[in-house]
A protein has these predicted regions:
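Bacterial N-terminal signal peptides
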Residues: 11-21
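Cyclophilin-like peptidyl-prolyl cis-trans isomerases
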Residues: 2-9, 22-239
C-alpha cells in the first residue's frame, strides 16, 4: 500500500470532521431525522484501561473492547511495542519499540479536541498500514472525553487519535470511538487544548506523551509521575 499519507486534520466545529489539510471536500452534516426513535442505552467500556502520562498531566481512558476490538488491540499493540509498524512504507519493519512514547499532541483546538499519535508530528504520519472503521450506532460523541481514531477518510485508521473536550455530535458515525476518559482527564484535555498555538493549531510549547501504560483487569494503576496538587488547607479560625 502506498503510504503517502495526507494530514489527518481536526477542523473547527463548523465543519467538525477530521479531514486532510489539502482536501477541498467537506463532509456534509447529517440531515435532521424524519422520525424520532428511542435510542438504546450507550454501551459501557469494559476493556483494558489506557493511561497516557503527558507533560501536562495524566489521561486515563477505559476502552470499548466489545465495540471496537480492532482499534483497541491496535492501540495496545503499538503502545506496548508488540505490534509491527513501519515509517518508510513498509521497507523497514519495527517491533519491540513503544510507538507512542515521546510523540506530540500536534493539533489542539479549544472547545473541541486534542490530537496526537503521529510519528511525523505534523498530521501526515502513521504506522505504515490502515485498518477499517468500527462504528457502533449506540456509541456516540454525546459526552466529553471520547477517545477516537483520527482518519483521512473511511477505513484509514492507523495510529493517530484524538480526545474530545466537549460533546461533538457532528462526528457521530464518522470515526471509531474506542475509549472513554474520566473527568480528571477531561480537565487535562481542556488545559492542553487551551495552550498557546500557531495558525495550524500546533502548540507553541510542545505537549508530549511521556509514557503509555495499559492496565488490565486486576492490575494496579501505575504511580502518577505528576499527581494533581492537593487543595490548600483552610487557615485555622482565629480564637
Amino acid at each position: 500500500m502506498n503510504w503517502n499519507r495526507k494530514p489527518l486534520r481536526a477542523l473547527t466545529l463548523t465543519v467538525a470532521v477530521l479531514l486532510p489539510m489539502s482536501s477541498a471536500a467537506q463532509a456534509d452534516l447529517p440531515d435532521a431525522p424524519g422520525t424520532v426513535s428511542t435510542p438504546k442505552a450507550a454501551p459501557e467500556p469494559t476493556g483494558p484501561t489506557i493511561v497516557i502520562d503527558t507533560t501536562m498531566g495524566r489521561l486515563t481512558c477505559k476502552t470499548f473492547i466489545r465495540q471496537a476490538p480492532i482499534a483497541v488491540s491496535n492501540f495496545i499493540g503499538l503502545a506496548e511495542g508488540t505490534k509491527e509498524w513501519s515509517l518508510d512504507q513498509g521497507k523497514t519493519k519495527q517491533r519491540g519499540k513503544r510507538f507512542y512514547d515521546g510523540l506530540l499532541f500536534h493539533r489542539v483546538i479549544p472547545g473541541f479536541m486534542i490530537q496526537g499519535g503521529d510519528p511525523a508530528g505534523d498530521g501526515t504520519g502513521g504506522p505504515g498500514y490502515y485498518f477499517d472503521d468500527e462504528v457502533d450506532p449506540n456509541l456516540t460523541f454525546s459526552v466529553p472525553g471520547r477517545l477516537a481514531m483520527a482518519n483521512s477518510g473511511p477505513n484509514t485508521n492507523g495510529s493517530q487519535f484524538y480526545i474530545t473536550q466537549v460533546p461533538v455530535p457532528q462526528l457521530d458515525g464518522k470515526y471509531t470511538i474506542f475509549g472513554q476518559c474520566d473527568a480528571h482527564s477531561v480537565d487535562v484535555v481542556t488545559a492542553i487544548a487551551n495552550v498557546e498555538r500557531n495558525a495550524s493549531d500546533r502548540p507553541l510549547t510542545p505537549v508530549r506523551i511521556e509514557h503509555v501504560t495499559i492496565v488490565r483487569e486486576g492490575q494496579p494503576m501505575p504511580p502518577d509521575p505528576n499527581p494533581p496538587a492537593a487543595p490548600a488547607a483552610m487557615p485555622a479560625a482565629a480564637h
